[in-house]
Amino acid sequence: MPTCDRSHYLYYLGAHVFFPDYAAFCDLAEKGNLIPVYREIMADMDTPVSAFKKLDNGTFSFLLESIEGGEKWGRYSFLGSNPDVIIRSKGACVEIVSNGAVTSRTVTDPLACIKELLAGYTPVEVEGLPRFFGGAVGYLGYDMVRHFENLPSAKPALLDSYDSYFLITDTILIFDTVRQKIKVVSNAHVTSPSNCEAAYREACSKIDAIIGRLRAPHTGMWSMPHNALMLTSILISHACG
């Protein structure tokens, strides 16, 4: 397999160090095509909720809290916004939203669409990150059980809501409450060895843009948007890693 050309390039921005560095990134690109790149910053000025306020731009966002034993907050909180892809279903109809375009399909198993979409990615684990560092985050409604079990016909729906709804974003924030640190992660998609440098640059730029928003003062009133997802760890589906 051809390898990335790493002889001339190591990416830093001022004093900002990204993990993995470019040489290690190229090595990882030989094992898979989705490599997480991250920067770590102190969490002394932000909480998951305050960061959510700064990142939410009125589109789709999520705050995913980890729970231990169903009663105690876990170590990590995960935040994401502005998804690249949205997958939602109602009955046998699945809609895939990407770049503002909506594609509809009639299927027997809506979850198979998520698996099919993610099958083109081979994520690579990077030291220093928890098991979850990206993937499809969302919910499954009660009626989704009809795709797994032979049940009587459903009663007419009283709510105009989707049976399932998943967001896929390539960049997320990981709050580590034990170490009081935030890891800003961007999953770089390497389509070919010649794409390594561009993919790494783009990931680093996305990370810096998010950190810039975190460090900017938050002004004005804010309320939870109607399309924000507040989730617990039991609702993770097909997490990378």
Residue ranges, per PLM feature:
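Extended accessory regions or peripheral subdomains of proteins
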Residues: A15-S61, I67-T106, Y142, R146-G241
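Exposed boundary/loop context
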Residues: S7, W73, E127-R131
